């Protein structure tokens, strides 16, 4: 299974999964149809699935156009998103598994950003390989999504699930927010040497207009404050030893950053 990033809107990524041997493809969170159409035609592959993480327009905006051109494809989304994702046919919940090109993805229910958000995780095939996590707007590189429909407690529970995955997991989040997220992270975790180093690297990448996605989960665990709600440094900064309260205060600060 090959994975490509497709740029969309101002800072979105659509992820194209494809198998050159079987000539089939799937897309994760298609915001716009044209980038997908162009790449499918260039690769000469058939679109068989849309994997949606949640219902927001910048994640499902291309669903209907893709269905119109590829009417046989299957649209996957969360069970709680029934009626909110265009063309949805399969309604997934925690513990479900979905197949693409001989690979099976595990489904995680990760409410917080929305009440129905899900994530897809393809475990590694061989020892030493990376797992692939498609997490929409739940976990960002250096950050996490705003809480539009969920609570801090729900988001901490959701991020705990994702944090428990192996360090050697590639994080395919749906927006290029890394540099701004790390700028914020430095305001709440200024003495974190790993974070300081990562910020310098990301700043250089973005100056050269290079993408920072996928991120690596092991790096996120060391540098992303929204995966470090239980670290002593952040507990001190947020003046709380209660993880959900630490997270809520972090999120409140980020919302106003």
UniProtKB/Swiss-Prot annotation:
Keywords linked to the UniProt accession: Hydrolase, Metal-binding, Zinc
Any one GO molecular function term: metal ion binding
Superkingdom of the source species: Bacteria
Pathway: Secondary metabolite metabolism; methylglyoxal degradation; (R)-lactate from methylglyoxal: step 2/2
UniProt record, GO biological process: methylglyoxal catabolic process to D-lactate via S-lactoyl-glutathione
Cofactor binding notes: Binds 2 Zn(2+) ions per subunit.
Cofactor or coenzyme needed: Zn(2+)
UniProt-listed CDD domains: hydroxyacylglutathione_hydrolase_MBL-fold
Keyword Transferase attached: no
Catalyzed reaction equations: an S-(2-hydroxyacyl)glutathione + H2O = a 2-hydroxy carboxylate + glutathione + H(+)
Binding, Zn(2+) 1: 54, 56, 113, 137
Cell division found in the keyword field: no
Family matches, as SMART domains: Lactamase_B
A Pfam family assignment: Lactamase_B
EC number: 3.1.2.6
Function statement: Thiolesterase that catalyzes the hydrolysis of S-D-lactoyl-glutathione to form glutathione and D-lactic acid.
Oligomeric and partner information: Monomer.
Family per similarity comment: Belongs to the metallo-beta-lactamase superfamily. Glyoxalase II family.
Entry protein name: Hydroxyacylglutathione hydrolase
Species whose genome carries this gene: Microcystis aeruginosa (strain NIES-843 / IAM M-2473)
